[in-house]
Amino acid sequence: MGKTLYEKVYEAHVAVAAEGETPILYIDRHLVHEVTSPQAFDGLREKGRQVRQVSKTFATMDHNVSTTTKDINASGEMARIQMETLIKNCQEFGVTLYDINHKYQGIVHVMGPELGITLPGMTIVCGDSHTATHGAFGSLAFGIGTSEVEHVLATQTLKQARAKTMKIEVQGKVADGITAKDIVLAIIGKTTAAGGTGYVVEFCGEAITDLSMEGRMTVCNMAIELGAKAGLIAPDQTTFDYIKGRKFAPTGADWDAAVEYWKTLKTDEDAKFDAVVTLNAADIKPQVTWGTNPGQVIAVDEPIPAPESFSDPVEKASAEKALAYMGLEAGKSLSEYKVDKVFVGSCTNSRIEDMRAAAVVAKGRKVASHVQALIVPGSEQVKAQAEAEGLDVIFKEAGFEWRLPGCSMCLAMNNDRLGPHERCASTSNRNFEGRQGRDGRTHLVSPAMAAAAAIAGHFVDIRDWK
């Protein structure tokens, strides 16, 4: 019987497979940031160990950094300590660090792919749940805990049981104006936020292969939001074209050999998945979350659902709680509620294509007077490219704030956050209670939908935008 893409990558990395024991995988890339690494480096220090493979370990600062200044003190005492500790640890252990003053600094899941650190067929880990982003390249990428960060630093390996496999196929082509963010939110709306628990998901179908690498990263980024361990997309010419010429990409004969291997990284026709989910791309409309998990999502032209519409008692209770927290009334349209803040950024939607999509909407218009709107590029490289294209001028003339790279308002770990009961149109990946600030209300949308909400002052259907 044939093998899935996941099975091929997993089996190629099994270093030790003792009978009755969880297999040990070799890890090709270890990405590190300031929040989940301090205790891991402390563990190495206490045990007298070194980093096993410094050439395969890359660190950056992203979660805590200020997006208004390069001052390491700007986000508070804990943030300063974490960033200073990362500097010290990387210097002591010889790990490459792209700190806040480096031209390659950025959100870890933006920085890795744009430098060619992320390559097809690799195993990639990071102490961050959205490591699944890198699966867009056909790599097996997943988040790990701090104790596992220490283990990978020390051994370049990790115990990892084989997961179940799920195929999510998005058949056909999407309509005009429908983005990768809409696709993945529609997927999660169908599977629910727990539908992928215990699985590694492979996304496929015409609507997926039509996506750019930026779009594919958006989809895989949110695999974790349907409960999956990881999400993968088979590499193809789009992948190879994106990687070629990047800083850490192979060159010359090594490039040719790599591409030949990468072409084998696809699911065999006779491979069997443990579960299969299909969607019709033509049915997908612009998506907006209404609740407090990404699975609580509707098309922008649909009414807010009533708890009574859910047959499952757990879902019904969850809907009741979510509506109360979000300050929404069932049956109404989301367009009836004003937004207070807009955030375009995060490891989901802060790449150059996301900046361009928001700029198309913003050009020649003005942000509504009651809205604060932030545009936060995902890395210094994205920022530089956007500025070279004049996108920053478009945003600033429209009344958006053009910020420095960082995780920003995705999570309340820096100065960018929501106040109590503030409503935000956000391009990030999580709308949990308090995720963007205590009692803040988060609605997940695409960059174009977010920019349009900033200008209109409320949610609008981007398909009607003139």
From Swiss-Prot:
Cross-referenced InterPro entries: 3-IsopropMal_deHydase_lsu (IPR004430), Acnase/IPM_dHydase_lsu_aba_1/3 (IPR015931), Acoase/IPM_deHydtase_lsu_aba (IPR001030), Aconitase_4Fe-4S_BS (IPR018136), Aconitase_4Fe-4S_dom (IPR036008), IPM_dehydratase_rel_enz (IPR050067), IPMI_cat (IPR033941)
Reactions that this protein is recorded to catalyse: (2R,3S)-3-isopropylmalate = (2S)-2-isopropylmalate
Its EC number(s): 4.2.1.33
Signal peptide residue numbers: none
An annotated GO BP: L-leucine biosynthetic process
Keyword flag Amino-acid biosynthesis: yes
SUPFAM superfamilies: Aconitase iron-sulfur domain
Pathway assignment: Amino-acid biosynthesis; L-leucine biosynthesis; L-leucine from 3-methyl-2-oxobutanoate: step 2/4
Record carries keyword Nucleus: no
Co-factor: note: Binds 1 [4Fe-4S] cluster per subunit.
Residues reported to bind [4Fe-4S] cluster: C347, C407, C410
Cofactors: [4Fe-4S] cluster
UniProt keyword annotations, A-Z: 4Fe-4S, Amino-acid biosynthesis, Branched-chain amino acid biosynthesis, Iron, Iron-sulfur, Leucine biosynthesis, Lyase, Metal-binding
Database matches in Pfam families: Aconitase
Molecular-function GO term, any one: 4 iron, 4 sulfur cluster binding
Subunit structure comment from the entry: Heterodimer of LeuC and LeuD.
The family this protein is said to belong to: Belongs to the aconitase/IPM isomerase family. LeuC type 1 subfamily.
Protein name: 3-isopropylmalate dehydratase large subunit
Organism this protein belongs to: Vibrio vulnificus (strain CMCP6)
Gene name for this UniProt entry: leuC
